[in-house]
Amino acid sequence: MKKILIRTATGLVYIALILIATLCGPYAFLSIFSIIAALGIAEMLKLCTKDEKPSVATTVIDILGGMAFFILSFSHYFPDFSVINPLWAGIGYILLRGIMQLYDKRRNAIRQLSASYMAMFLVVFPLSLLSKLYLEANGHTTLLACLIFIWMNDTGAFCVGSLIGRHRLFERISPKKSWEGFWGGLFFTIVAAVIIGTYFPAYFSEFDVIRWVGLAIVVSAFSTWGDLAESMVKRTAGVKDSGHLLPGHGGILDRIDSLLFVVPAVLIYINFVI
């Protein structure tokens, strides 16, 4: 019972922070998600270099470089940041990180560089794409809908999978996930999309019901793939959770793994499908 209460309290605090970031303006969004990016980088580095810790210097560069790239991705909204193009900042980071590795004689260069670049590619880059979604007209409501869909997908997958899950979805990577759970998550997500499009069109005014349902299907599928991708990394590292930051939930990557795959997929859906 105590574990359930801790897990519930942690989940509510996390959801509250994400809602504050999404609904309380760009400065709140930038501040909260910058911290999330930094924590995600640190966890990914730890997962990918489990047997060989990176140096403090390279870890600091990875975290600062990732936060800088994320913040600069909002440069078109914040004129003070527009003097530096995030593309050039990213190129500068890649060069600096590679040069730093030349002077680290004690560690495996391939493993260390792979961990750093993987953290940038799998954590920072998808989070940076949030700027493309959030800063569009009414983009914050689209992002809010995506978050609702992710949470409903997780809830549906857990409830249905726990009750009637029999057929393994991807046993090699995540033995507990089932096809029944997947379809349950998809059903919950589609129901949420229908409710949003039917009963809250004044607030969620970007799309009609059909397009919201299409978005829900995209979110459900890529949310599952994102979860599986992080499970693959954790299984390779031989750990159950990405960290211990969130009591009852694991690490920050355990909470945002779905979002990291959903954001790029949603942008493709919005820009090229509808």
Where do the PLM segments sit?
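Membrane-embedded alpha-helical bundles of polytopic integral membrane proteins
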Residues: 1-218
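Acidic active-site catalytic centers that drive phospho-/nucleotidyl reactions
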Residues: 43, 154, 227, 254-257
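Short helical (or helix-break) motifs at transmembrane helix termini and adjacent helical loops
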Residues: 152-162, 223-235
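Re-entrant/interfacial helical elements at transmembrane boundaries that shape
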Residues: 162-163, 233-238, 260, 265
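Hydrophobic transmembrane alpha-helices of multi-pass small-molecule transporters
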Residues: 189-190, 255, 262, 271
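Hydrophobic transmembrane alpha-helical segments of multi-pass transport and channel proteins
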Residues: 220-225, 252-260
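Interfacial loop-to-transmembrane junctions
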Residues: 235-258
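Juxtamembrane boundary at the C-terminal end of a transmembrane helix
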Residues: 267-274
